């Protein structure tokens, strides 16, 4: 099993660091702040073996240049080809399996357009590094993609095994659960998880990783077939709900203005 460590950055980002039992170094996911990563590697005396990038936003890519200067321009940096991210030297253009250089881990790349046009996720063993596509209790805003694209992307992720661990890039959980409660107030799993999440944050502990099973139980964006959510949408927007894509679009609109 991977050893995975969260490095808090900025106000609410997590830069995920992982290593396998066989490796003597680490990979980092979405290093928006290079200094945070450098400090961790100095403290642990671990070499940087590679970098995974999910999408082009600066809070996910801002540290690439510094890390390449420190650890070598030949350090593998994987990322979506279509987004032309500076420093990415292992561009990825399709879904499928790749083997991460220097660490030998088989990785499944999943294209998930919506938050950005080229956003990708990485599935390594049971760990899903999903950037800003899926959050605990929520999902990313639609900056470049369409509601239909994001709906399809989230549906794709929801079909992963229930025990898949979900490593999101932001600590947005409490705000997301506050919205989820407004949409599906009578969901017992949501009520229970909200108590747990508040307790974790009160101790300044991450609410992550989540799991696919948990998100299917509490995340309104993965629960569009819930009659309570459909009723909430119909009341909020004063219109009949015809299909899941419409439900998603309205739910995202509601969350954007919540």
UniProtKB/Swiss-Prot annotation:
Name the residues that bind Zn(2+) 2: 59-60, 132, 170
The record's CDD domains line, in alphabetical order, gives: hydroxyacylglutathione_hydrolase_MBL-fold (cd07723)
Give the residues the record marks as binding Zn(2+) 1.
55, 57, 115, 132
Q: Which InterPro entries match?
A: Clx_II_MBL, Glyoxalase_II_hydrolase, HAGH_C, Hydroxyacylglutathione_Hdrlase, Metallo-B-lactamas, RibonucZ/Hydroxyglut_hydro
Q: Does the keyword Magnesium apply?
A: no
- What range does the record give for the signal peptide? none
Keywords attached to this entry? Hydrolase, Metal-binding, Zinc
Q: Mind listing the GO molecular function terms for this protein?
A: hydroxyacylglutathione hydrolase activity; metal ion binding
Q: Which Pfam families match?
A: HAGH_C, Lactamase_B
Query: According to its UniProt record, in which pathway does this protein act?
Result: Secondary metabolite metabolism; methylglyoxal degradation; (R)-lactate from methylglyoxal: step 2/2
Give yes or no: UniProt keyword RNA-binding: no
Q: Which PANTHER family match?
A: HYDROXYACYLGLUTATHIONE HYDROLASE, HYDROXYACYLGLUTATHIONE HYDROLASE GLOB
What is stated as this protein's family in its record? Belongs to the metallo-beta-lactamase superfamily. Glyoxalase II family.
Q: How does it assemble?
A: Monomer.
Protein name per the record: Hydroxyacylglutathione hydrolase
Q: What gene is it encoded by? A: gloB
